Swiss-Prot record:
This is DNA-directed RNA polymerase subunit Rpo1N. Its cofactor is Mg(2+); Zn(2+). GO terms for molecular function: DNA binding; DNA-directed RNA polymerase activity; magnesium ion binding; zinc ion binding. The keyword Ribosomal protein does not apply. InterPro entries: DNA-dir_RpoC_beta_prime, RNA_pol_asu, RNA_pol_N, RNA_pol_Rpb1_1, RNA_pol_Rpb1_3, RNA_pol_Rpb1_3_sf, RNA_pol_Rpb1_4, RNA_pol_Rpb1_5. It holds the Pfam family RNA_pol_Rpb1_2. DNA-dependent RNA polymerase (RNAP) catalyzes the transcription of DNA into RNA using the four ribonucleoside triphosphates as substrates. Forms the clamp head domain. It comes from the Archaea. Binds at least 2 Zn(2+) per subunit. Gene3D superfamilies: 1.10.132.30, 2.40.40.20, 6.10.250.2940, 6.20.50.80, RNA polymerase ii, RNA polymerase II, clamp domain, RNA polymerase Rpb1, domain 3. Keywords: Cytoplasm, DNA-binding, DNA-directed RNA polymerase, Magnesium, Metal-binding, Nucleotidyltransferase, Transcription, Transferase, Zinc. One of its GO terms (biological process) is DNA-templated transcription. Its main location: cytoplasm. It comes from Thermococcus celer.
């Protein structure tokens, strides 16, 4: 009969009673030692064979199993005197304050008790409400100085961390004195509390009697939980828990013998406190108020609490996150020639990682050859598994034997092959695209190869980043990874609904060089670039022009070969500096919808992209076409032609752009920042005017003529007006630099097309750095009444407060360099602090939201069925599948319908 599967309904935690500890114990431990001189476990010692065995050749005396099979068994130590369990110290204090010192009843009247029990029934299982009631009961009972049940006087109890309780008593004369409550007295008081009162103090009589919080018996964990290790020198090193238990047993034995010998109370109390210290640090070695237990080397011991807590602890380190097999990690390198959904895997890794493949009649011959190749020859196999589940390791001497035995139904653990599905991940994994499924491409050398377009979701660069690769081991896992996680399914970001996997840097500059006005290519170049990009065409289109008998094709015509044949889209791109020219084209399209190609070419302008039926008629390609976040063209291809077509387009367009940029040349150097004399004169003029403006503002402030901005003081008004004047000066200087450098300048091309950087960066390189700021204000910290000694005290002028008039090209003065370093320092500190804060915030958020899910009715619920949101995200829309927050783009549907109808005539 099959075993009936059961679902866990709930888990209850309780406290172990002394009886339970003794019952589950296999041996009482009395000897504070581990092994004898022969290296054999001592009976009654901490490595007693009844607690399990870890040494090969020995058998467990409790279950009879050998090392590796025996799970280990608990032991126990009978404590000579009770000690407080540090984890319950605060709870004990609360319970002592709430109950009578004589009769043990809770210090509430019978009517109040009845009323609170009724309230508990009403709250049911709502934890927060219950906790509130328990807090209220404690507050009320604590203030009662006479027991309502037996009438005996009560005394306040002071708790001294970590485990000391004082009763503030009064003598006959009314003088207050402190009486220390030893753990035995505490335990006696807790024993008096009747079971019926326990729910009112938040305890359950069956699972957690209060006196169990004071230990009389200490459980000793199994040997398997605290194994010894043998060092290279042959010396045995014990686990931290074993060290601590040795201390506990040694002091416990001393305390026992002193009690039996009738030693003075003072000595007994000292030893008792020492036992309490050892038990406390055994449970938690980070208890505040006492020094941590340390090794001879000074390293604090890792005891029970430290094994569970924190990032390296049992929960986060071994349960939520654990190390896995079938994974690899190495440095990443760029490879523009592989597809976005591929990953280049080094041959060494492909031969080490395996995929289990079942032998069928279809793949029998292929797998047989792999078995014959063995582990040393690629493509081979490392193991085979027979139908009984026996693993056979393939070695040079058994390859032919195993290959002969191989039959349908066996499993071969073969090397990674091209096309296998693997998971690729870069840490920190901040969003779901930090781990995606790629197809294997086995390659030489020792680094993973990654297509450049896939860097943004991983936030990867190639300055030494390492990435992880995981190999799914079952067909189900591979299918799941392929369907849910493959790279092309994540081109659109779920954050903002625009492309995240897109052309970057060189791809965008190259796209511009290919498609800008006046870019023409000869037949040999066209054939080369199409072959390089992997574009399959039956024959080349007609040349755009013939010059001196040479056929020339425009970059726009070549780019059009990559586009779907019925794609129509138009938009203003980043290069649209002359709105009038863009408006002329928009008007033409509005009037005719499908204007004549020649009409469009007559008005064509790099700043306005117009694609009609798969032909690029106007505009250069920049970040607005297939860049990250902005890529309108890529976005349309994903949504209207599917992710596979988008992958093909992205693969081809990036290779094409790389061919153009490498063959036509694209360099940026220091001479890109050279400005003519008249430009430098104009910039100096702008700086002079700005400084004069600032001086006028300071004068107006000192003469009391400055009008304060509403809500700001005079000083704040002055500062904000100075900041505005200096920011305007920097922007004007930037415009001058931009005008003189022009679109023939490669640095400007990068900034204007959105490939890399902004015009501000060029301004700072060529014109001037401008005002340095800390927290949005001018620099003000430094010497008294001035930032640096190079300026007069009280000088509020532009240069004295961090205005840098030089550019990187012209070089900064020492004062300017110092000001610039002040601004830069803030950026570094800010980055470091933000990273830590956002990481911790994300962890808390994940922990809070991890068990919420969207049900089939569209609501978001927690596991108990409580509704968190009636519609996911308040609108129920997935940004990946929506059009700017709408479920459908009506204009686009109308446009496509009209185009189809016009096409049919």
């Amino acid at each position: 009969m099959q075993s009936i599967k059961k679902v866990i309904g709930s888990i209850d935690f309780g406290i172990l009673s002394p009886q339970e500890i003794r019952k589950m114990s296999a041996a009482e431990i009395t000897v504070p030692d581990t092994y004898d001189e022969d290296g054999y476990p001592i009976e009654g010692g901490l490595m007693d064979k009844r607690l399990g065995v870890i040494d090969p050749g020995l058998r467990c005396e409790t279950c009879g199993a050998r090392a590796g099979e025996c799970p280990g068994h608990f032991g126990h130590v009978e404590l000579a005197r009770p000690v407080i369990h540090v984890g319950f110290a605060k709870t004990i204090h609360r319970v002592l304050e709430s109950t009578c010192r004589e009769c043990g009843r809770i210090k509430l009247t019978d009517e109040e008790i009845e009323e609170y029990f009724h309230k508990f029934e009403v709250t049911g299982n709502r934890k927060k409400a219950k906790d509130r009631l328990i807090k209220e009961i404690h507050k009320k009972a604590k203030e009662r100085m006479v027991c309502p049940h037996c009438g005996s006087p009560q005394f306040p109890i002071k708790f001294e961390r970590p485990t000391v309780y004082w009763e503030l008593r009064k003598d006959e004369e009314g003088n207050e004195y402190k009486h220390r409550m030893m753990p035995s007295e505490v335990r006696d008081r807790l024993e008096k509390i009747p079971d019926r009162d326990l729910p009112l103090i938040g305890l359950d009589a069956e699972k957690a009697r209060p006196e169990w919080m004071v230990l009389t018996v200490l459980p000793v964990p199994p040997v398997t939980m605290r194994p010894s290790i043998t060092l290279e020198s042959g010396i045995r090193a014990e686990d931290d828990l074993t060290h601590k238990l040795v201390d506990i047993i040694r002091i416990n034995n001393r305390l026992k013998s002193n009690i039996e010998a009738g030693a003075p109370q003072l000595i007994i109390e000292d030893l008792w406190d020492l036992l309490q210290y050892h038990v406390t640090t055994y449970i938690n070695n980070e208890t505040s108020g006492i020094p941590p237990a340390k090794h001879k080397s000074g390293r604090p011991l890792k005891t029970l609490s430290q094994r569970l807590k924190g990032k390296e602890g049992r929960f986060r380190g071994n349960l939520s996150g654990k190390r896995v097999n079938f994974s690899a990690r190495t440095v990443i390198s760029p490879d523009p020639m592989i597809s976005i959904n591929e990953v280049g895997v080094p041959m060494a890794i492909a031969m080490e990682l395996t995929v289990p493949e079942k032998v069928t009649e279809f793949n029998f011959e292929k797998l047989r050859k792999m078995v014959l190749n063995g582990p040393e020859k690629y493509p081979g196999a490392n193991y085979v598994i027979d139908p009984e589940g026996r693993r056979i390791r393939l070695m040079e001497n058994n390859l032919e034997t195993v290959a002969e035995k191989l039959d349908i139904g066996w499993t071969v653990e073969r090397h990674l092959l091209d096309g296998d599905v693997v998971l690729f991940n870069r840490q920190p994994s901040l969003h779901r695209m930090s781990i995606m499924a790629h197809r294997v491409r086995v390659m030489p050398y020792r680094t993973f190869r990654l297509n450049l377009s896939v860097c943004p979701p991983y936030n990867a660069d190639f300055d030494g980043d390492e990435m992880n690769l995981h190999v799914p081991q079952t067909e189900e896992a591979q299918a799941e990874a392929k369907i849910l996680m493959e790279v092309q399914n994540h081109i659109i970001s779920p954050r903002y609904g625009g492309p995240l996997i897109a052309g970057i840097q060189d791809h965008i500059s190259g796209g511009y060089l290919l498609t800008r006005e006046g870019a023409y290519f000869e037949r040999t170049e066209v054939e080369q670039m199409l072959m390089f990009a992997g574009v399959d065409v039956d024959r080349l289109p007609e040349p755009d022009k013939v010059e001196n008998g040479v056929e020339l094709w425009s970059g726009k015509t070549i780019f059009s070969l990559l586009l779907p044949k019925d794609l129509t889209i138009w938009y203003r791109n980043k290069l649209c500096d002359e709105p009038g020219r863009c408006e002329a084209l928009e008007k033409l399209i509005e009037e005719k919808l499908i204007p004549d190609e020649e009409e469009v070419r007559a008005l064509a302008y790099d700043g306005f992209t117009y694609i009609l039926n798969g032909k690029l008629l106007s505009g250069a390609i920049d970040k607005t076409a297939y860049g990250r976040e902005d890529g309108k063209l890529l976005d349309i291809i994903v949504r209207e032609y599917g992710v596979e077509r988008a992958r093909q387009f992205l693969d081809q367009v990036t290779k094409l752009a790389i061919w153009v940029i490498t063959h036509k040349g694209f360099t940026t150097a220091i001479d890109d920042e050279d400005l003519p004399t008249e430009a430098l004169d104009r910039i100096r003029e702008i700086i002079r005017e700005a400084e004069e403006r600032v001086n006028r503002l300071i004068e107006a402030y000192r003469n009391g003529e400055l009008e304060p901005i509403p809500g700001k003081t005079l000083e704040e008004t002055l500062e904000s007006k100075i900041m505005a004047a200096l920011a305007e000066a920097r922007d004007n200087a930037g415009k001058v630099a931009e005008r003189y450098l022009g679109m023939s300048n490669h640095a400007v091309i990068m900034a204007k097309t959105g490939a890399r950087g902004k015009i501000l960066n060029i301004t700072q390189m060529a014109a001037m750095l401008g005002q340095q700021s800390i927290r949005g204000k001018r620099l003000y910290r430094g010497y008294r009444e001035r930032v640096l000694t190079h300026f007069k005290p009280g000088d509020l002028g532009a240069r004295a407060r961090g205005f840098v008039i030089n550019s990187y090209k012209s070089g900064l003065t020492p004062q300017e360099y110092f000001f610039h370093a002040m601004g830069g320092r803030e950026g570094l500190v800010d980055t470091a602090v933000r990273t830590a804060q956002s990481g911790y915030m994300q962890r808390r958020l994940i922990n809070a939201l991890q068990d919420l899910k969207v049900e089939y009715d569209g609501t978001v619920r927690d596991p108990t069925g409580i509704i968190v949101q009636f519609r996911y995200g308040e609108d129920g829309i997935d940004p990946m599948r929506s059009w700017k927050g709408k479920t459908i783009d009506v204009n686009r549907v109308v446009l496509r319908t009209l185009l189809k109808l016009r096409g049919k005539g």
